């Protein structure tokens, strides 16, 4: 299959080698004033030990040619955590803006765009030889306060069209794929009751894809959803929606499966689920992977977490149409999980002091095993 642009596989490998060499030479001496273990809520600067890549290698260095292993990026980490940029550059060959490209952050007032946060991430990614996945264009959350539900449908549609067009055009040629619509399904598989559905009708989904295609014909366009990683009723509904959209000529190029998982309740048959979507002729991607555990995180709990991470990566690698696996942040220092799932945390590959956890080792082991077997 054709893989993400604009970076070639060879270019990614060269960039990976250069980045890892730079990190090793620099030693990543880290200084700071933050409190270790703070999940990033205060936004304070942090201290952490020096980062040294595993003797086995790095995720990006071991990834099969053409496969992206990415992470969501938090600008607070870039700006406040001395160890963060080095781990980001050495371990991952793709990035997603965690929040910087969401509408509320990009357009705080009508027609006034705040590109700095997104531009910082894109510029850094290209210096690091990393592909960029855009997130997200149309969502029911993070809509600016100035967008009024009282507007007539025609005005609301035009504002949404202008938003999608402006953002995709701004990053044209620098973002390989976009989450065009995000979380459009309710738990029962029907279209979610949102401002967009109530005012514009179900056609807003197709409209968003067509606007994005016009703004950047080369970007790959994804629909992104949670609770659909395994064979669930919601996944069945998503499969049917994608099939209908493509039958109507809507340019849906890919399906993103978020992957916010619980270590004690992993999804069933991720591999088979990815394959049935791929059979529609679309790419598939794991877009927001984290595996939360109930605290305290014992050694046994972290072992189970590692097994879930490895199984998701294995499922993607077994499906030719799977373009990427992206973790939703790589350090517990900046994870969103504790703020939204009470009693849970430790969801990432690195702990709050940027030390790799068993889950990171499990992913490396899977990649090394693939290299040995040629799989």
Locate predicted features.
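Short, acidic/polar
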Residues: 75-91, 157-167, 233-245, 308-313
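Acidic-and-aromatic substrate-binding clefts and catalytic sites of carbohydrate-active enzymes
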Residues: 51, 72-83, 103-116, 185-189, ...
């Amino acid at each position: 299959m054709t893989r993400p642009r604009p970076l070639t596989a060879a270019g990614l490998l060269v960039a990976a080698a250069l980045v890892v060499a730079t990190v090793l030479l620099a030693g990543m001496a880290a200084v700071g004033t933050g409190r270790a273990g703070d999940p990033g809520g205060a936004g304070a600067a942090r201290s952490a030990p020096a980062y040294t890549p595993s003797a086995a290698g790095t995720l990006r260095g071991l990834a099969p040619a053409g496969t992206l292993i990415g992470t969501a990026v938090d600008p607070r980490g870039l700006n406040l955590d001395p160890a963060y940029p080095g781990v980001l550059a050495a371990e991952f060959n793709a990035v997603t803006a965690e929040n910087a490209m969401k509408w509320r952050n990009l357009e705080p007032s009508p027609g006034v765009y705040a590109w700095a946060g997104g531009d910082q991430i894109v510029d850094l990614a290209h210096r690091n030889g990393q592909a960029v996945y855009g997130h997200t264009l149309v969502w029911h959350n993070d809509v600016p306060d100035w967008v009024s539900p009282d507007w007539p449908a025609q005005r609301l549609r035009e504002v949404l069209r202008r938003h999608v067009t402006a953002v995709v055009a701004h990053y044209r040629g620098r973002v390989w794929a976009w989450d065009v619509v995000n979380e459009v399904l309710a738990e029962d598989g029907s279209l979610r009751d949102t401002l967009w559905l109530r005012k514009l009708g179900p056609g807003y989904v197709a409209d968003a894809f067509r606007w994005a295609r016009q703004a950047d014909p080369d970007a790959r366009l994804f629909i992104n959803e949670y609770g659909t990683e395994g064979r669930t009723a919601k996944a069945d509904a998503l499969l049917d929606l994608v099939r209908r959209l493509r039958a109507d000529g809507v340019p849906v190029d890919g399906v993103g499966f978020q992957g916010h998982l619980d270590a004690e309740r992993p999804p069933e048959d991720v591999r088979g689920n990815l394959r049935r979507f791929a059979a529609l002729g679309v790419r598939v991607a794991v877009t927001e992977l984290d595996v939360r555990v109930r605290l305290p995180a014992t050694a046994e709990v972290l072992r189970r977490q590692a097994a879930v991470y490895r199984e998701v990566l294995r499922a993607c690698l077994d499906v030719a149409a799977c373009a990427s696996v992206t973790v939703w942040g790589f350090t517990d220092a900046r994870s969103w999980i504790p703020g939204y799932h009470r009693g849970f945390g430790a969801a990432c590959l690195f702990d709050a002091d940027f030390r790799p956890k068993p889950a990171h080792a499990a992913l490396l082991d899977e990649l090394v095993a693939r290299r040995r077997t040629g799989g």
